[in-house]
């Protein structure tokens, strides 16, 4: 009797920059030497969509080429559709999101569609990783790092039931330092709104730029990137402030 061949690795890719973005296409090209790659991504840029789901209209899905699907929806919609419908009978081994065109550091992760896509994969039981390039030039560098992470996971699975947020400096590969495990830093709140007039004279507003780093000390993702290191931050989705449970219980019982 012949031995059964090992099942080939299967990877789902998504993002928030859109199905035709350079980051996701570069990542897919790099990973196709390792695995079957299926792209399910938004039909346009959905940066900042966070974990939003489309509930008031249908999701329109178009197969734009073999194993590449465009979805009129958010990054979370894309992964939800892929795992609960498109690939439900043969789930992927990994969900990867990115490569994002820009950083997802500190509390950026609360707004990030890139991180949200990975979070949805995590919710649905698949090991998930978000990749972001801190810039818009060296996507090949970021894709090479992503491939190394996947290869290491294949050799020895990631030892934690957490989704990973990985940021890569926008540098040539040979200029990168090592990889550091970090915690999330924090930014000052963005307070500036940009007020303009549209062609009809109506007031319109744009959100201002992100605030500057507030907590960027040693051990944070901000600090690692500034020093030229790749940053890996394990994330959890339980938002419970466990250290506050007893204090809240005491407060409620006080007369």
From Swiss-Prot:
This is 5'-nucleotidase SurE. It comes from the Bacteria. Nucleotidase that shows phosphatase activity on nucleoside 5'-monophosphates. It catalyses: a ribonucleoside 5'-phosphate + H2O = a ribonucleoside + phosphate. Binds 1 divalent metal cation per subunit. GO terms for molecular function: 3'-nucleotidase activity; 5'-nucleotidase activity; exopolyphosphatase activity; metal ion binding; nucleotide binding. It is an enzyme of class 3 (hydrolase).
């Amino acid at each position: 009797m012949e031995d059964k061949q090992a099942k080939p690795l299967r990877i789902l890719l998504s993002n928030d920059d859109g199905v035709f973005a350079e980051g996701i296409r570069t990542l897919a090209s790099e990973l196709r030497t390792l695995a079957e790659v299926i792209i399910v991504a938004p039909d346009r840029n959905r940066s900042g969509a966070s974990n939003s789901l489309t509930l008031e209209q249908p999701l329109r899905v178009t197969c734009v080429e073999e194993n590449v699907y465009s979805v009129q929806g958010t990054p979370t919609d894309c992964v939800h559709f892929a795992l609960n419908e498109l690939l439900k009978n043969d789930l992927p081994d990994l969900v990867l999101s990115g490569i994002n065109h820009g950083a997802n550091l500190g509390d950026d992760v609360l707004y990030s569609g890139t991180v949200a896509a990975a979070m949805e994969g995590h919710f649905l039981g698949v090991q998930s990783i978000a990749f972001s390039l801190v810039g818009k030039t060296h996507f090949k560098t970021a894709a090479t790092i992503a491939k190394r992470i996947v290869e290491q996971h294949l050799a020895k699975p990631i030892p934690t039931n957490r989704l990973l947020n990985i940021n890569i400096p926008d540098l040539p590969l040979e200029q990168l330092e090592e990889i550091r495990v970090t915690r999330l830093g924090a930014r000052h709140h963005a307070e500036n709104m940009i007020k303009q007039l549209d062609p009809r004279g109506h007031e319109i507003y744009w959100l201002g730029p992100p605030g500057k780093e507030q907590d960027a000390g040693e051990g944070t993702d901000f600090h690692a990137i500034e020093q030229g290191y790749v940053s890996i931050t394990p994330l959890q989705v339980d938002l419970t402030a466990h250290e506050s449970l007893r204090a809240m219980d005491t407060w409620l019982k006080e007369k």
